[in-house]
Amino acid sequence: RLGIPVLDVPWANSLADVRSITTMLGDELGAPETAKAMLAEMDREIDAARAGAPRPPVSGILYEPNGYASVGGITNEIMTMSGIVDVAPKSQLTRTGTLPVEAVVATAPELLILGGEARVGSARAYTILHHPALQALKGRTTMEFASLTPLLCPGPWSVGAAKTFGDLARKARALAPAKARH
């Protein structure tokens, strides 16, 4: 009514969605070459992630503030290409999408990625990432904090998380023989 153009941009739930939305935005905003360049960089990062991924993949859970477990969607695609198979027990997710810490401990993945800050006290949401029950995983699970900002709003930049995931997966794989000896 006011003559202001509005562009409705859908949420990307997969890398295929990222590709189509980025192309659409490039066309709509008069920057198709920029969109193509962003997608080409995304493809290079995907190729690098796949090439460096440990095989067989390590079992992992991405555990986030307030106890949310990332399951499915673009995050799962990026974890998979980086050599991590998501083993978060979907059947144990609460109706709000959180995963009880007991389920994490019972699953005992090779890799537990704690999405957020390693320091305690910056926000109440982070307290579960420091839950004493997680100490039961020491010696069995590689536990690492990781900032996963590229995943907050899906776009070509989101595959930047693949490097972090890949580095952590390779670390978990390298530490696995040492853990087996103890």
Regions found by a protein language model. Give the residues of each.
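Acidic/His-rich segments in extracytoplasmic proteins that coordinate ligands and/or metal ions
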Residues: 1-28, 98-141
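Extracytoplasmic substrate-binding proteins
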Residues: 1-67, 88-89, 141-182
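Internal, well-ordered alpha-helical scaffold/interface segments
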Residues: 23, 40, 65, 73-80, ...
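Short secondary-structure boundary/capping segments
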Residues: 51-53, 76, 134-135
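Short gly/pro-enriched beta-turn/loop segments at secondary-structure junctions
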Residues: 53-58, 72-74, 106-107
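Histidine- and/or cysteine-centered catalytic micro-motif in compact active-site loops
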Residues: 63-66, 91-92, 109, 117
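Short, solvent-exposed loop/turn elements at domain surfaces
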Residues: 67-74, 114, 121-122, 152-154
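His/Asp/Glu-enriched short active-site or ligand-binding loop at hydrolase and phosphoryl-transfer sites
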Residues: 74-96, 116, 141-145
